[in-house]
Regions:
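Intrinsic low-complexity, disordered N-terminal segments enriched in polar/charged/small residues
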Residues: 11-13
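N-terminal beta-strand motif that seeds the catalytic metal site of vicinal oxygen chelate
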Residues: 35-59, 120-122
């Protein structure tokens, strides 16, 4: 029996460079060492932070334009006690969400729109590429080129409200 099956009935998807089995169950991946199990138990990526200028325009972009769900918008405090908001959005049915974090200071403001160093940093998979592309164009989303066919499907690059590059990918 593989180490993946021994831990929550997962399936083996390959092996890491360090020799650990890469296991998969549903949308959760984890590493299981050949020495007797997972070094960290089941692991999933819960949130990815995106630094934004202001919360409300970012919420409107992700919810109204990209059809994400607003999962949480709660008052919170910075590490030094100043007020902020805890804002999480995610695609419907997805396990991983985006934490919309308002820039706090010049260093954080400097990375707005550059979080992936001018590379595509985010990948949005859709079931109906044509409909998603048309809806986003109607909402005046900035695309960096026309859709193209790749071995994995249709793809085009767009910018989010902050200027981060995303791939829109569909069949």
């Amino acid at each position: 029996m593989s180490h993946c099956r021994q831990h929550a009935g997962g399936r083996r998807d390959g092996q890491s460079p360090g020799g650990q089995d890469i296991c998969h169950l549903g949308d959760t991946f984890w590493a299981a060492s050949s020495g007797g199990g997972s070094y960290a138990g089941r692991v999933h990526l819960g949130l990815i932070a995106i630094v934004v200028r202001e919360y409300d325009p970012a919420i409107r972009f992700f919810v109204d334009v990209l059809s994400f769900e607003l999962v949480e918008d709660s008052p919170a405090l910075t590490n030094d006690g100043r007020p902020k908001r805890w804002v999480v959005v995610r695609p419907p049915g997805a396990a991983t969400g985006l934490l919309l974090a308002r820039a706090d200071g010049d260093d954080q403001a400097a990375v707005i729109g550059k979080q992936a160093a001018d590379r595509v940093g985010f990948f949005l998979h859709v079931e109906d590429f044509g409909a998603a592309y048309a809806r986003m164009r109607a909402a005046r989303v900035r695309f960096l080129g026309p859709p193209r066919s790749e071995p994995y499907g249709q793809v085009t690059v767009f910018l989010d409200l902050a200027g981060n590059k995303w791939d829109l990918i569909g069949p």
